[in-house]
From Swiss-Prot:
Superkingdom field: Eukaryota
Organism ancestry: Eukaryota, Fungi, Dikarya, Ascomycota, Pezizomycotina
One GO BP annotation of this record: proteolysis
Name the UniProt record assigns to this protein: Pro-apoptotic serine protease NMA111
Name of the gene: NMA111
UniProt EC number: 3.4.21.-
GO CC field: nucleus
Subcellular location: Nucleus
Amino acid sequence: MELNGSPQKPKRKHSGDPHSLPSAKHLRPDSAAPSSPRISGDQTSGDLAVYGYRNVDSADAAAMQMKLPAVQTDSAEWQETIETVVKSVVSIHFCQTASFDTDLSMSSQATGFVVDAKRGYILTNRHVVCAGPFWGYCIFDNHEECDVTPIYRDPVHDFGILKFDPKAIKYMPLTELKLQPESARVGVEIRVVGNDAGEKLSILSGVISRLDRNAPEYGEGYSDFNTNYIQAAAAASGGSSGSPVVNIDGHVIALQAGGRADGAATDYFLPLDRPLRALQCIQKGELVSRGTIQTQWIIKPFDECRRLGLSPEWEAEVRRVAPKETGMLVAEIVLPEGPGDGKLQEGDVLIKANGELLTQFVRLDDILDSSVGGDVHLLVQRGGEDLEVTCKVQDLHAITPSRYVTVAGATFHDLSYQQARLYAIACKGVYVCEAAGSFKLESTFSGWIIDSVDKRPTRNLDEFIEVLKTIPDRARIVLSYRHIRDLHTRGTSIVHIDRHWHPHMRLAQRNDQTGLWDFTDLADPIPAEPPVPRKADFIQLDGVSHPAAADIVRSFVRVSCTMPVKLDGFPQARKTGFGLVVDAEKGLVVISRAIVPFDLCDINITVADSIIVSAKVVFLHPLQNYTIIQYDPSLVQAPVKTARLSPEYIKQGAETLFVGFNQNFRIVVAKTAVTDITTVAIPPNAAAPRYRAINLDAITVDTGLSSQCTSGVLLGEDGVIQALWLNYLGERTQSSHKDVEYHLGLATPSLIPVISQIQSGVIPRLRILDMETYVIQMSQARVMGVSEEWIEKVAKANAARHELFMVRKVDCASPLSADVRPLEEGDIILTLNDKLITRVSEFDMMYDQETLDALIVRNGEEMKIKIKTVPTEDLETDRALIFCGAVLQKPHHAVRQQISKLHSEVYVSARSRGSPAYQYGLSPTNFITAVNGVKTPDLDSFIREVSNIPNNTYFRLRAVTFDNVPWVVTMKKNDHYFPMSEYIKEPSAPLGWRTVNYDRGKERRGTGDIANLNADAMDEGRDEGVSDVEPDIE
């Protein structure tokens, strides 16, 4: 089960007693099974290990394979029992389509078994049924498949019930398994019958070793409590969550729930008393009542109870009435403001409930569940003294969230009893279960509690909704919040409310009749207030001996870019850096393209750390890693200064002044010198192509500050800027799966023609040679057939660097294009339009030429060819289709740079967690070539074909991987949670893009939400590891 990552430090430190071993939830998909025990938090004893749920995806299953003991041959009786049992066991494949409560959106698989063949009820784990929106299907033993919907998930205990249509199973008689909780006894031989990651049936044997184990704590996230667990040696493997634990009679005596993930052959099963009661209630058409006094109890052995004050008289009485008992129930957590608050205390030993001597959870549950809305009378011992208390029994369902609201890209609901219990806090407040969009707080996915919005308290979800209804689009408001792991620290942030990319405030309400979550739009966005001009002054640099450095502060602005969807393989949803003002009168700013990668985004510029104005993309350079953006200068009443750019190329060894901004966005200054100017190409990213700079001369300087600063300039003594200092997005490392950023200088002369055109009101429409080159020295050139005459000409033309350029890669043409690429890999370029090419800057002639006459050396022979340049506007993305959670677009420029053949113009750029694309394995970097056997060479033909596919229906996609491997993926369409939508670039639209929503295949234009779309929950890389969307959490 893919959840929040490796377990964090547990809230409470338990003793090493087996009653209370701490647990961790699961292994990450990218982690291997531990070879030695892994200890949670600050525990260092080597005898404790973590525990894992047994529903995982195939990657998890591969990581969690364990060495099993030698298998014994089952008796004939056992074989007959298993043959009967397996007919009722199903493999469940499911998604939680949206983050909710303790779990992020995810796709996984597990096991269940039929408990009512007539009505179509399947029993499985609660963490399979999911607290949030569920979408899934099950596969029977004969490989028949049918949809399943949740009809019950317990608020606390780890079981839930799914429903299927019995009429959908046509080729096998349906049989059900009988639940017999009373047959679970120590020494009973059992079999765990489940699926091994959905691939095949696994049958594991074991023997029950104890019945009175406390429910394991799985760290952060969902954990069962207020029940005992059954322990056995079975070594269940990945995918067996929800498996029936059967005895030799074929009766189910427990439910597989969790186990140790360190290789120890120990598993933990949920007793079936409460699942059996819930099933009987549902079969009778009754509500499953669940009561609580918001108190967690745990089993403690008698020796610990004596230390807590259990009197000898009561111990003797308990041992007399229940001679087999070895412990009693003790209050572990009493939640503030709950029914037990002020009446019970941690450490109270429970003696009686409603006059009945009580030592087991099952009777306590019985009493509470039958007393909802009434009172329960408890007798406890506290420090050796008897104490009688009366508590109101609360409805447990009432404090379990069954709705959430999505607004400004983030998801919220009332704090759940699960989270409140884990952190021993009052069960109230607004909980952020998907911190994204406007509410992306401190790079954490979830866990925030919102105390106030816009200086107004938000004590519950209803108050939160009412406050958000009054906040206009693009408003900046004060947000007060705390993280559930650190409630002592209150955070305050200014958030920018996005109601234009995400205009709808949408309420999702669980519907237990249909098994779906119903969506309601709560309020239309309030239009943004017109911006007003504001005044500000820039900071003064103290102690700087260089006047030019002090003055350049007025030419820098801070740029923040937020992207509503991941395009072009870009790994982040938000970036921040500093830009250089190159025309203060027109509001033109140059910024790294690693900060503003494309124009489907929100850009905000902060001037003088005071004035915030929006900006738009004017120009994206296809090769040299810079973007030109523009803001409205009439809104800025500050002494912004136009930076002066040098028309001369800076030389190696030249002294210069480095002015940059470090990671804290503080300006730093150092006198330095240029150490090297070399032609570079940023390494390509193997996992997923994304924009990178190629064919440019990069400048490096002799100061350690250069590696710490992502933005800045190289400045002459006269205040003229000689080079921009930019960050360049590079490859993702194989080991850490983190993106590499390079910090290099870019000389200013190449910028000046582009800026001049923009200043004159003309957007540059550059044409480029669609190739990547690299430098070769004369020794290599001579071997490859360059004549001595040309070698001499090179030496005269470029005395500083004797080099020529060889074609490393020719960009791939569109499959719909008839263009022929005259250049080939390995060609050495001598001249273009009769000009010898020995510097990267000399390629700039291509920008305004449709064709170039080239003299090249190919296979040792000189030849003349005509090269047609490519218009760069064709290389930028102008359309993105969201289908079944996948982002589809034309192959962007970086794809064409890295691939040798484009298989279609339908390219998978990213996909969302918990979506059909994720569940069925449609991976980023795949090309889709056909739908149901009909070729779809472009997005229009793809839309036509998929629009004809009914909802909840399987269809076939023919795809080709980035490595040219064709394959077929079968997917099921889900329009309820993942309707088809589209972004289309339209300069006349207010945002520069318009949105198209498809309702049952019919186009509806507007600016509506792209439903269930969250850039922070998107994965843009192939399945080789974790992306920046889900960074490693240590």
